[in-house]
Amino acid sequence: MKIKNIQELYQIKLHSMDTILHQISLMDKVEDEQELSEIIHSLLQAIGNYTGADRVYVFDWETDQKDSLSNTFEWCADEVTPEIDNLQAIPVSLMPNWMKRFENKEVIVIDDLEATKYSEPEEYELLKTQEICSLI
């Protein structure tokens, strides 16, 4: 999508924010898993559009022991290859730095993946294989 001017960008952002809030409000009225799944997919798309992301994921714990994660929902922009099938039962040992931050309820923001190559080598490798350059 080619944006012509700043006003158009603000309109897109405003519409995406409205969609995000609307999808969140619908969660209180969900009657079954299929409906929840549809709302989550719409919400991920709106978040992707709002942030300009290529992909938006949701991960859940794979086991009660919380030793691995699986990608349960994914939205991808046009012409972006889905990774959901490759992101199943990922051992938390592949992301030790992130797990510490998650436990402290910290947000992870990576503006430039290459800047994490030496400080977070495990996470770097995990993201590099998916051709991810930045992450929130």
Positions of the model-derived regions?
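Signal-transmission linkers at sensory-effector interfaces
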Residues: 1-39, 49
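Per-ARNT-Sim (PAS) sensory domains and their PAS-associated C-terminal
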Residues: 68, 129-131
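Short, conserved clusters of charged catalytic residues that mark active-site
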Residues: 38-43, 93, 118-122
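Short regulatory alpha-helical segment in sensory/regulatory domains of signaling proteins that mediates
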Residues: 25-35, 43-52, 60-63, 127-128
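Terminal output helix/cap of sensory domains in signal transduction proteins
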Residues: 98-99, 124-127
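GAF sensory/regulatory domain recognition
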Residues: 57-105
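Soluble sensory domains of the PAS superfamily and closely related sensory modules
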Residues: 99-108, 115-119
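A short, aliphatic-rich beta-strand micro-motif
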Residues: 133-136
